Amino acid sequence: MYSTKCIQKQAHKEGIWCCTWGENRNRNKQYIITGSLDNGLIAWEWTNSQLKCLYQFEGHRLGVISVDINSTGTLAASSSLDSQILLWDLETGRLTKTYDGDPADTWTIAFSPDSRFLATGSHTGCVNMINVQTAQKEGSIQLEGKFVYXLAYISDGSKLAAGTINGLVSICDLETGSVQFLDGHATPVRSVSFSPDGRLLASASDDKQIKVFDVRDGRLVIPSLNGHKGWVVSVDFASDNRHLVTASTDCSVRIWDLASKEEKHCFNTHEDQVWCARYSPQGNNIISVGDDRSIMIYQCA
């Protein structure tokens, strides 16, 4: 049931810190974006169980630390240690917009489900909302925690979750402006992910744990999923709402079953720290990237 489907070694010149998997349904194409400390991004097409390099984006002056693809699969966004956010057209490969943030102001990014806004997390604990069409900031939300490591939108776009360096998980109601704080971790929260049905929120932390919250009342549904031996730096929900994939500095990628609250499978194919893992839009494949400069694609269905 679980197997390694594709290995792309030396995909970048340096470690790969971020990846995302999107889909353009109108063109029947699946796109993968990887970002590296070599300052570059690569857009890949996943076709016939193989990775095809489409574009090598150049524009950042320092390492790329966060990437995302909009809901229509037409636009990619990247943020870098150079404090810039760049928007890329996935049909032409051209740079379309540039947003210059403050130093350490663009550590993480996330497209809104309607593709109109790009949320960015900053070192001050502020979440900025960037208009995709104008590349201008249109609003911000101040959180209690400092240094926003992770952002995730709920599927209907009404809420935005954030993870911060002091272990707080926040759920921002974008319609009312209220913020709910979930105190679940004692160390930095590196990644958050909503279930596709919007009922659950998963968080991953340096404390080696994954926690799952009820979005409605903030109740801790699963206090801890244990198994990783290092920081858990990435978490993502499967399309079935019942499974999670996590990546860790212990060099492993793990799949979790939420019903049994147990690890279902562990991939140990990377030779160094793994920084990001994401499900494909259909949920039948997983991508992972890490410091070994490799891209791994796994079959999970």
Curated annotation (Swiss-Prot):
The keyword Flavoprotein does not apply. WD repeats lie at residues 11-54, 59-98, 101-140, 143-182, 184-223, 227-266, 269-300. InterPro entries: G-protein_beta_WD-40_rep, SKI8, WD40/YVTN_repeat-like_dom_sf, WD40_repeat_CS, WD40_repeat_dom_sf, WD40_rpt. It comes from the Eukaryota. Keywords: Repeat, WD repeat. One of its GO terms (cellular component) is Cdc73/Paf1 complex. Gene3D superfamilies: YVTN repeat-like/Quinoprotein amine dehydrogenase. Signal peptide: none annotated. PANTHER family: SUPERKILLER COMPLEX PROTEIN 8 (PTHR44090:SF1), WD REPEAT-CONTAINING PROTEIN 61 (PTHR44090). This is WD repeat-containing protein SL1-17. It comes from Schistosoma mansoni (Blood fluke).
